[in-house]
Amino acid sequence: MKDRLQELKQRTKEIELSRDSHVSTTETEEQGVFLQQAVIYEREPVAERHLHEIQKLQESINNLADNVQKFGQQQKSLVASMRRFSLLKRESTITKEIKIQAEYINRSLNDLVKEVKKSEVENGPSSVVTRILKSQHAAMFRHFQQIMFIYNDTIAAKQEKCKTFILRQLEVAGKEMSEEDVNDMLHQGKWEVFNESLLTEINITKAQLSEIEQRHKELVNLENQIKDLRDLFIQISLLVEEQGESINNIEMTVNSTKEYVNNTKEKFGLAVKYKKRNPCRVLCCWCCPCCSSK
């Protein structure tokens, strides 16, 4: 009889080697497939483009805040008449930049409102993208509103300074005028107050007259700035009214959610209490002490 033990051992080694190589190949293939996998949500909206626009808009609002701050710092002190022409030129440049930036930000905020409504229709009001857009719009709109209120207060304070300066110069020259007369003069455009007849009527120097004329020009420029921004403030007030309704709806939703959570807590408490008093549970605990110990 032929001894085939060596042949069997050789065959066994070959089978083991082939099995090991097959297992390693399978693991490599599985690992390769796993590395290529990625979690993809086909219906999830992409918010990167919205975030890019929001970041750009936020930078514009920050630049507007810086310009308003510069404008306010220039109004803290009255500059001498020798520097007043250069000051008026700088103020005119800053106010033009503020107007352009404010109009751009206002248009961008309106576009963001349209994106919010579009996201509500496509993704639903409770989707992540919709909530992000709403919160970002509310925060940036509130910041923009505060900046424009500060700018408006600065212009109003500058007007009062100019009126006070004109009244003081006229009092020094011996010409008594009330604040109402100055306001009427500015609104009606009575330029004859600053002509040569006033110079001959009272003892006023040409330097004082030049000071008054410069202050009057500043007031006229401020009036024009306020007229330019009037439409913008009207749009802001309309947006405030719309935001007020949204805030009321959010408050009602939060209150109803709070009541629902409280009711749920009470129901959970009753459920736990009834579970402990369940007679079947007590009977099982007496019959099966091992289960109760677990």
Swiss-Prot record:
InterPro entries named in the record: SNARE, Syntaxin, Syntaxin/epimorphin_CS, Syntaxin_N, T_SNARE_dom
Topological category with respect to the lipid bilayer: Peripheral membrane protein
SMART domains with a match to the protein in the record: t_SNARE
Subcellular location: Cell membrane; Cytoplasm
Principal subcellular localization: membrane
Domain of life where this protein originates: Eukaryota
UniProt entry keywords in alphabetical sequence: Cell membrane, Coiled coil, Cytoplasm, Membrane, Transport
GO terms of biological process kind: exocytosis; intracellular protein transport; synaptic vesicle fusion to presynaptic active zone membrane; vesicle docking
Domain (t-SNARE coiled-coil homology): residue spans on this chain: 209-271
GO MF term (any one): SNARE binding
Gene Ontology cellular-component annotations: endomembrane system; plasma membrane; presynaptic active zone membrane; SNARE complex
Presence of keyword Membrane: yes
PANTHER family: SYNTAXIN, SYNTAXIN-19
Biological function: Plays a role in endosomal trafficking of the epidermal growth factor receptor (EGFR).
Record text on subunit structure and interactions: Interacts with EGFR.
Family under the similarity heading: Belongs to the syntaxin family.
Protein name: Syntaxin-19
Naturally occurring in which organism (per UniProt): Homo sapiens
Gene name linked to the record: STX19
